A protein has these predicted regions:
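Hydrophobic packing residues within well-ordered alpha-helices of enzyme cores
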Residues: 23, 49-53, 164, 168, ...
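Mg2+-dependent phosphoryl-transfer enzymes with acidic/Ser/Thr/Gly-rich catalytic loops
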Residues: 1-3, 20, 187-268
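Short active-site oxyanion
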Residues: 35-39, 63, 151, 211-213, ...
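Conserved acidic, metal-coordinating active-site core of Asp-based
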Residues: 98, 102-216, 237
Length: 268
């Protein structure tokens, strides 16, 4: 059995958020003919993985969902929760105020909505397009986010997120992990949560080793899983420093890079 961890945005789908037939066919072939189990490893919330999981028939082949950058791990078929790591509730006001001080916006999630104080934020609208989940405006983010959360998301222009990331690490770095998943998204998660550490836990549950794993990604929140995997693959559209740390660089997501990687690494 082979395990294949796939980032979604910038990797599995195009910038138009399309799963091409070439990539879909290659992944169905990998599962059907090469005993491969797919793990969708994304910063997206759980509901935003469903349509892709269904299109790829992941549940039928015993695959897994890893939303929130690995903050949760679920069996795709049964939805049984294998692991969950959550931000402590006392961190939410601190994160909120840091984000506000740096002129960015903060979001989080329910099962049905993206919570925000600002409905007119173009960066929040990008998350709506990516996840397919509607925004729900709340008068007070802090009062609305009263439960432990897998993550918050700071959104805004890169020039605001870079100093915000540094401030989070300086002031809350013993409890919060902060890393960019795009030029306008800063992920705020429990310390130690990343796709690599989550995959290491899943490998342990399954009795597998990193050499059984291929991981494909395009951004900084994919780096730990690319480095963990026996074969770490960077997309052709990934930043150069991500590509340098991968074992293999495939074509871009506009050129069916996932399918090309499988042709070179699995279908041989």
């Amino acid at each position: 059995m082979k395990l294949l961890a796939l980032d979604i945005d910038g990797t599995l789908i195009t910038k138009e958020h399309v799963l091409t037939e070439g990539v879909r066919s290659a992944l169905l072939r990998a599962q059907r003919d090469y005993d491969t189990r797919i793990i969708l490893a994304s910063g997206r919330p759980t509901p935003a993985l469903g349509a892709l999981a269904e299109a790829l028939q992941i549940a039928d082949y015993g695959g897994y969902l890893m939303p929130f950058n690995g903050g949760k791990i679920l069996e795709a078929g049964s939805k049984r929760l294998l692991s969950a790591q959550l931000l402590d509730t006392d961190l939410i006001p601190q994160l909120y105020h840091l984000v506000q001080e740096h002129g960015a916006n903060i979001l989080t999630y329910t099962e049905e909505h993206i919570l925000t104080e600002r409905e007119d934020d173009p960066y929040a609208e990008k998350e709506v397009i990516i996840t397919g989940m509607p925004l729900k405006r709340v008068p007070s983010f802090v009062k609305a986010a009263t439960e432990s959360l897998p993550k918050c998301l700071a959104v805004g222009p890169l020039e605001k997120l870079i100093p915000l990331e540094a401030a989070v690490k300086e002031q809350l770095g013993t409890r919060v992990g902060a890393f960019r998943s795009s030029d306008y998204f800063l992920e705020l998660v429990p310390l130690g949560v990343n796709k690599g550490s989550a995959l290491a836990r899943l490998l342990d549950v399954l009795g597998r080793i990193p050499q059984d794993l291929i991981a494909i990604g395009d951004n900084y929140n994919d780096l730990e899983m690319i480095e963990l995997a026996g074969t770490g693959v960077a997309m052709g559209n990934a930043p150069e420093d991500i590509q340098r740390r991968a074992d293999f660089v495939t074509r871009s997501n506009a050129e069916d890079g996932v399918a090309y990687a499988l042709e070179q690494l699995l279908f041989v």
